[in-house]
């Protein structure tokens, strides 16, 4: 009887270990979960915090919400996973709207309008720029921007994989359709 009980307990312990090992998500599936969450996450219209200007909330809340919904409308394909102990990388191809080109168009238009005299001393420049920027960003129709990025994963002490999606500038730039790259390019041209 003792042998039978010991055997049953041993089998249960083995099954628990086997299920725990199988239940652990791979880096690839954790990245997929993170991407799905980003695409469906509810966003608050907090433009004033983003741009550090409370008046923007009232003026541009709708346009900002529309833009954020477009940002969340990216497509992705998980390409490759490489695991090395407690570290892993997952390659993801992002396809989205070319917000970088829209940003550059906005910048070029503002510069041209300033040179031509369309922007005068009486022009509310901030209002003009934000209206033009949101108009250009929200009018992008095709998902023509494509970039493959590497998401870094780390296994924590609980054996769970975590990602650097929230701090990965390359990923964020891809999700934003190259907008960070466009901003850097414009800033470099001013130097």
Predicted feature locations:
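C-terminal motif of bacterial Sec signal peptides marking the signal peptidase cleavage site
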Residues: 18-21
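Extracellular/periplasm-exposed beta-strand and loop segments of Gram-negative cell-envelope proteins
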Residues: 65, 103-105, 136-141
């Amino acid at each position: 009887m003792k042998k039978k009980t010991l055997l049953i307990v041993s089998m249960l312990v083995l099954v628990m270990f086997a299920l725990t090992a199988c239940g652990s998500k791979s880096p690839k599936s954790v990245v997929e979960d993170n991407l799905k969450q980003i695409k469906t996450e509810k966003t608050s219209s907090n433009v004033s915090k983003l741009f550090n200007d409370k008046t923007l909330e009232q003026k541009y809340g709708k346009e900002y919400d529309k833009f954020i919904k477009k940002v969340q409308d990216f497509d992705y394909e998980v390409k490759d996973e490489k695991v090395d102990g407690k570290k892993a990388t997952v390659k993801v191809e992002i396809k989205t709207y070319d917000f970088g080109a829209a940003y550059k168009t906005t910048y070029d238009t503002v510069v041209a309008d300033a040179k031509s005299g369309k922007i005068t001393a009486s022009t509310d420049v901030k209002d003009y720029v934000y209206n033009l920027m949101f108009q250009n960003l929200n009018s992008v129709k095709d998902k023509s921007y494509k970039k493959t990025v590497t998401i870094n994963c780390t296994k924590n002490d609980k054996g769970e994989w975590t990602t650097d999606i929230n701090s990965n500038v390359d990923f964020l730039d891809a999700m934003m359709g190259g907008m960070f790259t466009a901003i850097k390019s414009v800033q470099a041209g001013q130097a």
